Curated annotation (Swiss-Prot):
It is an enzyme of class 5 (isomerase). The gene is groEL4. PROSITE patterns: CHAPERONINS_CPN60 (PS00296). It comes from Frankia alni (strain DSM 45986 / CECT 9034 / ACN14a). This is Chaperonin GroEL 4. Belongs to the chaperonin (HSP60) family. Keywords: ATP-binding, Chaperone, Cytoplasm, Isomerase, Nucleotide-binding. One of its GO terms (biological process) is protein refolding.
Length: 540
C-alpha cells in the first residue's frame, strides 16, 4: 500500500490536531459537573458514558496523521486504565497540556530532547511528592468516598466499600447486569468454582437442590475416573472414618459413578462427584489451588500418584462443602497457611509477568479465591442505555477504590498534582531546555483543576491562584463552589491513579515532541459506483 510522509512541524501539528480532537471530546466529562458523551453503536442502542477510555476507544479520525495522533493519546488512556483502572480523563488532559506547551517551545527553537529530559525529571519528582502526600486508607468511609467520587453516587460508593470490606484487599469485586431494578450485593463464603454435581442423585437437601457435606474428605484427581476397582480401596478407607467424600476430577463415569450413586441412595455412604473447573493447564492450576486450600494433593500420574494406592493423608479437608447444579463452594479449607501464602505469592508474580488481559483476569480470580473472597454487585436499571452507563461507572469506581487501598489517597479535584508540583519544583535545579521542559510540566499540572473549574462554570485561572495559596490538602469543592479541606470532606483520589495518569501522559508527550517524521497509509479514493445500464424496452 502506498504511504504518505510528513516532516518536522507539519508532522507534529498533524499529530496534535488528532490529539486535540480526542482530548476535547474526553475532557468535558471531568469533575462532579462534567457532562456525558453519547457513543453511536452500529447495532443496538447508543451508549451514554463519562468514562474517558470508553470515549477514546470509539474515536476513529479520517485524516491519517490526525488518526495517528489520536491513537497515541488513546494509548495513554488505555495504559492508565490497565494499571490503575481509572484516571483516564485526567491522563488525557495532562497529555494534551504537555504536548501543546511542548510543541510551542519546539516551534520557538527549543531542543526536543532537552525538553523531554526536563519533563522526565520533573515528573519523577512530582511522583515522589505524591507518594509522600499519600495517606493510607484507614476507614471504610474513605473507601466509600473514593468510590462515590468516581461513580458520582454515594449509594454506589457505600456498596463498593462494603464489598471490599467483606472480601479483603486480595478479593475480587465483579459487576454484573441484573434483571431486577437497583443495586444488590452478593458475597461468596469460601472458594467457589463454576461446576456442580455430576448426578442429581447426590443432592442431600431436596428443597434447595443442594448437596451439603460437613467435614468431608476431598479427593482431587487430574483425570477421569471410570473403573470402580481404582476407587474401591480409597472408598473403604473413607467409609471406616464415617466421613463423607467429595471427588473433584475431570469426570466420574461408568461403574465408578454408579457405585457412588447406589451407596448414596441406600444411605450406606454419603458422597458427591464434581467435574473439575477449567481446561488444560488452567484446570491443572485450579486443582492445585484447591489442593493447597484444603491441605490435600492432586492425584496425578505426572507426580507419580495413582488413584488405587491413594491414602487418606493425600486427601483434602474442609469444614463444609456445598454443591449445587452449577457451582461448588469450599468453606474453610484445612490447608497450611504458609503454603497458601506461598501459592498466593506465586500467582501474584504470574500476574505481574502476564501481558494478556484475559490471563491477568483469570489469575486475579484465582488469587481472590485463595486469599480473599468474591463479591458480585448486581446492577439493574429502567433502560438498557442507563444499565450500561451505570455498570461502566461502577466498574470504574471499584478499580478506583482498590487503587486507594493499594497506594493510599491524596486530595482530589486536581489539587494533589498542583500542590505536589509546588514542593517538587522548589528542589529542582535544571538549566536551559531541561528547565523549560520542567516548566512545561508545572504549567500542565494546572490543566486538570482548570478543566474541573471550567466544567463547573468557574474561571480556571482564578481557582488555580486561590488553591496555590491554600494549605496542603485544601482546594475547591467543585460541586458546591466552596474551598474546603478536601480529605476531611471526602473529596479524594487514589494516589496510584493520579501518579499513573501523570507518568503515562509524560511518556507519550516525550514521543510527540521528539517526532520528526510521520509515515501513514495513503487514503484510498473510493471510485464512484458505475451507473447501471438502461432497461430498454422492458415491460413491468
Amino acid at each position: 500500500m502506498p504511504k504518505i510522509i510528513a516532516f518536522d512541524e507539519e508532522a507534529r501539528r498533524g499529530l496534535e490536531r488528532g490529539m486535540n480532537q480526542l482530548a476535547d471530546a474526553v475532557k468535558v466529562t471531568l469533575g462532579p459537573k462534567g457532562r456525558n458523551v453519547v457513543l453511536e453503536k452500529k447495532w443496538g442502542v447508543p451508549t451514554i458514558t463519562n468514562d474517558g477510555v470508553s470515549i477514546a476507544k470509539e474515536i476513529e479520525l479520517e485524516d491519517p496523521y490526525e488518526k495517528i495522533g489520536a491513537e497515541l493519546v488513546k494509548e495513554v488512556a488505555k495504559k492508565t486504565n490497565d494499571v490503575a483502572g481509572d484516571g483516564t480523563t485526567t491522563a488525557t488532559i495532562l497529555a494534551q497540556a504537555l504536548v501543546r506547551e511542548g510543541l510551542r517551545n519546539v516551534a520557538a527553537g527549543a531542543n526536543p530532547l532537552g525538553l523531554k529530559k526536563g519533563i522526565e525529571v520533573a515528573v519523577e519528582r512530582v511522583s515522589e511528592e505524591l507518594s509522600k502526600q499519600a495517606k493510607e486508607v484507614e476507614t471504610k468511609e474513605q473507601i466509600a468516598s473514593t468510590a462515590s467520587i468516581s461513580a458520582g453516587d454515594s449509594a454506589i460508593g457505600g456498596l463498593i466499600a462494603e464489598a471490599l470490606d467483606k472480601v479483603g484487599k486480595e478479593g475480587v469485586v465483579t459487576v454484573e447486569e441484573s434483571n431486577t431494578f437497583g443495586l444488590e450485593l452478593e458475597l461468596t463464603e469460601g472458594m467457589r468454582f463454576d461446576k456442580g454435581y455430576i448426578s442429581p442423585y447426590f443432592v442431600t437437601d431436596a428443597d434447595r437442590q443442594e448437596a451439603v457435606l460437613d467435614d468431608p474428605y476431598i479427593l482431587i484427581v487430574n483425570s477421569k475416573i471410570a473403573a470402580v476397582k481404582d476407587l474401591l480401596p480409597l472408598l473403604e478407607k473413607v467409609m471406616q472414618t464415617s466421613k463423607p467424600l467429595v471427588i473433584i476430577s475431570e469426570d466420574v463415569e461408568g461403574e465408578a459413578l454408579a457405585t457412588l450413586v447406589v451407596n448414596k441412595i441406600r444411605g450406606t455412604f454419603k458422597s458427591v462427584a464434581v467435574k473439575a473447573p477449567g481446561f488444560g493447564d488452567r484446570r491443572k492450576a485450579i486443582l492445585g489451588d484447591i489442593a493447597i486450600l484444603t491441605g490435600g494433593q492432586v492425584i496425578s500420574e505426572d507426580v507419580g500418584l495413582k488413584l488405587e494406592s491413594t491414602s487418606l493423608d493425600l486427601l483434602g479437608r474442609a469444614r463444609k462443602i456445598v454443591v449445587t447444579k452449577d457451582e461448588t463452594t469450599v468453606v474453610e479449607g484445612s490447608g497450611d497457611p504458609d503454603q497458601i501464602a506461598g501459592r498466593v505469592s506465586q500467582i501474584r508474580n504470574e500476574i505481574d509477568k502476564s501481558d494478556s488481559d484475559y490471563d491477568r483476569e483469570k489469575l486475579q480470580e484465582r488469587l481472590a479465591k485463595l486469599a480473599g473472597g468474591v463479591a458480585v454487585i448486581k446492577v439493574g436499571a429502567a433502560t438498557e442505555v442507563e444499565l450500561k452507563e451505570k455498570k461502566h461507572r461502577i466498574e470504574d469506581a471499584v478499580s478506583n477504590a482498590k487503587a486507594a487501598v493499594e497506594e493510599g489517597i491524596v486530595a482530589g479535584g486536581g489539587v494533589a498534582l498542583l500542590q505536589a508540583s509546588i514542593t517538587a519544583f522548589e528542589k529542582l535545579d535544571l538549566s536551559g531546555d531541561e528547565a523549560t521542559g520542567a516548566n512545561i510540566v508545572r504549567l500542565a499540572l494546572e490543566a486538570p483543576i482548570k478543566q474541573i473549574a471550567f466544567n463547573s462554570g468557574l474561571e480556571g485561572g482564578v481557582v488555580v491562584d486561590k488553591v496555590r495559596n491554600l494549605p496542603t490538602g485544601h482546594g475547591l469543592n467543585a460541586a458546591t463552589g466552596e474551598y474546603v479541606d478536601l480529605i476531611a470532606t471526602g473529596i479524594i483520589d487514589p494516589a496510584k491513579v493520579t501518579r499513573s495518569a501523570l507518568q503515562n501522559a509524560a511518556s507519550i508527550a516525550g514521543l510527540f515532541l521528539t517526532t520528526e517524521a510521520v509515515i501513514a497509509d495513503k487514503p484510498e479514493k473510493n471510485p464512484a459506483p458505475a451507473v447501471p445500464g438502461g432497461g430498454g424496452e422492458m415491460d413491468f
